[in-house]
Design a protein with these regions (language model features):
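Patatin-like phospholipase
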Residues: 1-44, 49-284
Length: 284
């Protein structure tokens, strides 16, 4: 099986990934078709939105147009919290160094619960509007989140008994920015706090194409970085990291709705540049 892995990266990440796929389709339509039809779609945080959107059957051109639409952007919220503020809270939660990863993630969960954010229903309404369909597709769509009680990664899918909107909302619940998502007796935060790509969730696949809305040298608090995580995948991989032009287009705040248009356009340009490499990897 082959997986299309869509990484986390805020509103900029949603726009960029949509743009990259659109750009690949501009130059290599068959490569786009094969990517979208991958046996497994894995989405983390921003990537969960894109994975759910493309699995809905809505054409990529329409999804791209939504990223450029001011009317669509008006449905998004600007949390008014800087990435630096969030990073500071995370660093505090990472102490003491001898704590296990799960213990540190539990502390991040405490930060998330204590943060002043919009209400869960208000945030859920934003996610509802993003998704063309609120039903799980019949195909294999996987969405990552973190259970704040255990600090463990949870992979939602169509047999989890969880509504798609709730799964995506959980995966996009950046701690300290958006409220944790309550599902039954559990509360969940962004799957990206463990990894922006969570390659461990697709180890049953023999190949993976990975879109990462971050630079290739992006570090991770849990290891050597996203690039190393992808390199360690047991199957074959092709990773597309945001290049310098795309990173510049993102601007200073990945959560600011104003970044959507520039990030989408930059992603489309990069997708065109990457299309031949992607097609070659897919054997086209």
């Amino acid at each position: 099986m082959r997986a299309l892995v869509l990484g986390g990266g805020g509103l900029a990440g949603i726009a960029w990934e949509t743009g990259v796929l659109t750009g690949i389709g501009d130059e290599a339509p068959e490569a786009l078709r094969v990517l979208v039809d991958s046996e497994v779609l894995l989405g983390t945080s921003a990537g969960s939105t894109v994975a759910a959107q493309i699995s809905s059957g809505l054409p990529i051109d329409e999804l791209f147009a939504r990223q450029l639409s001011a009317a669509e952007g008006a449905h998004e919220m600007n949390p008014g919290v800087s990435i630096d503020e969030i990073a500071g809270k995370f660093l505090e939660a990472m102490l003491p160094p001898e704590a296990t990863r799960e213990q540190k993630l539990q502390k991040i969960g405490v930060v998330a619960v204590a943060a002043a954010t919009v209400s869960e229903p208000a945030r859920r309404a934003v996610i509802e509007h993003r998704l063309p369909s609120h039903e799980w597709p019949r195909r294999e769509l996987r969405v990552t989140g973190v259970d704040i009680a255990t600090g463990e990664l949870v992979v939602f899918h169509n047999a989890s008994g969880v509504a798609l909107v709730d799964a995506v909302a959980a995966s996009c619940a950046v701690p300290g920015v958006w409220p944790p998502v309550t599902i039954g007796e559990h509360r969940f935060i962004d799957g990206g706090v463990i990894s922006t790509v969570n390659m461990a969730a697709v180890t049953d696949c023999g190949a993976a194409v990975v879109l990462v809305p971050a630079g290739v040298h992006t570090a991770s608090p849990w290891g050597t970085g996203v690039a190393a995580e992808i390199d360690a995948f047991p199957g074959s991989t092709l990773a597309v990291f945001a290049d310098a032009e795309s990173l510049a287009a993102f601007g200073p705040d990945l959560l600011d709705p104003a970044c959507r248009g520039p990030a989408a356009r930059a992603g489309r340009d990069q997708g065109r540049r990457e299309s031949a490499r992607v097609a070659d990897f897919l054997g086209l």
